[in-house]
Amino acid sequence: TWAEGDKEATARLISEAVRMYLLLAVPATVGVAAVSDVMATALFEQAYVEGHSIMFWVAFGMMFLGLTEYSIKPWELTANTKAIFKRSLIGGAVNVGLNLILIKLLGSYYIASVTTFIGFFVYFLLARYGTRSQLRWKLKGKSLFRILLSAAIMYLAIYILKIFMPFNKINLVLFVFCGMIVYGLVLYISGEVKNEANLVLNKIIKK
């Protein structure tokens, strides 16, 4: 569609791809926040458990890095590697600069995970606004709300389970599984994935 000059069709295609990406990336990121303490307790030595919150910031940053891949599509399609390199360089410089300042100032390497997120977020913003005149993908506010709400309810469900159950490997798997079920159910009830779910169900029934 891009090669044919149909930018609107390309924008719709990328917008749907972004929606599908967020359907997976948001719960994955929120899930890391929900079970990072369980994961650290069950899998790591005691000395490393305290740093479990680092996992969330790394996952949060990676989520925005994934979004950036969709934002830079116009530059990729036109082989404008200079624009990509320039923005990624700025994002990296922000990360390094903040590390040099804040780690020395605060004396905590925990801040490195936060600055990594900030660097990825800056890169995303630069890419998003840098390509908006060429190709602007959009995500419906209703879809974003449903995804965030479903992820929030998933987090709450896992949080409640953690109150009553010990942190170990078996329960880690249980928390993740229950979180996936809750997220999927809320998404379906909200109507966000009802069409996709019904399509899959119909294919299974026909077989």
Task: Name each region found by the language model.
Residues 83-109, 119-130, 146-162, 178-187:
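Alpha-helical transmembrane segments of multi-pass membrane transporters
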Residues 16, 50-54, 108-112, 139, ...:
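Residue-level signature of transmembrane alpha-helical entry/exit and packing/kink sites
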Residues 70-71, 97, 113:
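Transmembrane alpha-helix boundary/hinge residues in polytopic small-molecule transporters
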Residues 71-79, 128-142:
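Alpha-helical transmembrane segments
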Residues 21, 55-58, 62, 88-92, ...:
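Residue-level recognition of transmembrane alpha-helices
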Residues 35-40, 44-48, 79, 102-107, ...:
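Short helix-capping/hinge motifs at transmembrane helix termini and TM-loop junctions
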Residues 1-88:
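Specific pore-lining/lateral-gate transmembrane helices of multi-pass inner-membrane transport
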Residues 156-207:
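Membrane-proximal transmembrane or re-entrant/amphipathic helices at the cytosolic face
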